[in-house]
Amino acid sequence: MPTTYATLAPPAILFAHRGARAHAPENTLEAFRLAVRLGATGLESDVWRTADGDAVLDHDGVVGTMFRRRRLAEVATADLPGHIPSLAALYEACGVDHDVSLDVKDADAIDAVLDAARAAGALGRLW
């Protein structure tokens, strides 16, 4: 029987890209909660800033139909479709016991991202 040795390496992070998007609409609280329930130890999303300064999670950064599309930076958080969560809502729904990797698509979102992570006590697990 081979000898096994303890490792100093931390365990791998199992990131759920846009949540459990194979089983729930991507980048929704439903998808992120499901990913955590299925064993993800990390959550990943793109992040944008709204007109009123909130960090929100969405892939495309636009809302609306073909002829009425608007960038998230032009829309207040309260006017967004219900399926687009804020980063603060992600922390409320899923807790802070996992890593969060954010692809910052809008440089103006950085302060809002840091504020939300800091308020949740999750700054140390933010990628």
What are these regions (language model features)?
Residues 4-14, 41-42, 47-99, 105:
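An active-site metal/cofactor-coordinating segment within enzyme catalytic domains
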Residues 16-26:
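Active-site mouth loops of central-metabolism enzymes
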Residues 22, 51, 108:
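Feature marks short, surface-exposed loop/turn motifs that line or immediately flank catalytic pockets
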Residues 24-34, 84-87:
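Short, acidic/polar
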Residues 31, 86-90, 109-116:
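A general structural detector for well-ordered alpha-helical segments in enzyme core domains, enriched
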Residues 38, 93, 112-120:
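Alpha-helical structural signal in soluble globular domains
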Residues 79-83, 99-109, 117-127:
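Catalytic beta/alpha-barrel core
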